[in-house]
Swiss-Prot record:
Residues 90-127 are annotated as: Disordered. This is Small ribosomal subunit protein uS13. Residues 101-127 have a biased composition (Basic residues). GO terms for cellular component: cytosol; small ribosomal subunit. One of its GO terms (molecular function) is rRNA binding. NCBIfam families: uS13_bact. One of its GO terms (biological process) is translation. It comes from Rippkaea orientalis (strain PCC 8801 / RF-1).
């Protein structure tokens, strides 16, 4: 079982894809890491030797900020924006889109599920 930065990599996937399970490592960065460490990207995670796993772990920990450190850094940046009172910080705090998107319609991902407001009731028809 390959474990890097506290994350178990899926055994049946290729190493190239398995590394993307680490927060902060995407496909291109994964390919870069494998090229630098000399590990074949087509190798399955279960077939990695202990030495290869140790090399990957050492290279990633020395050259990249991943998982908890990256999440903490991101949260601190958002908190800093909110503390200095920027528009972006306010939008983060309110849970609204930060980058200028419209909110009259759409923005469901940021705003959450719809909250239906009862409309005006229809008057009974006269017959």
């Amino acid at each position: 079982m390959a474990r890097i930065a506290g994350v178990d990599l899926p055994r049946d996937k290729r190493v190239e894809i398995g590394l993307t399970y680490l927060f902060g490592i995407g496909l291109s960065r994964s390919q870069e890491i494998l090229a630098e460490t000399g590990v074949n990207p087509d190798t399955r995670v279960r077939d990695l030797t202990d030495e290869e796993v140790a090399n990957l772990r050492a290279y990633i920990e020395t050259n990249y900020q991943i998982e908890g450190d990256l999440r903490r850094w991101e949260a601190m940046n958002i908190k800093r924006l909110a503390d200095i009172g920027t528009y972006r910080g306010r939008r983060h705090r309110q849970g609204l889109p930060v980058r200028g998107q419209r909110t009259r319609t759409n923005a469901r991902t940021r705003r959450g599920r719809r909250v239906t407001v009862a409309g005006k009731k229809k008057a009974p028809s006269k017959k």
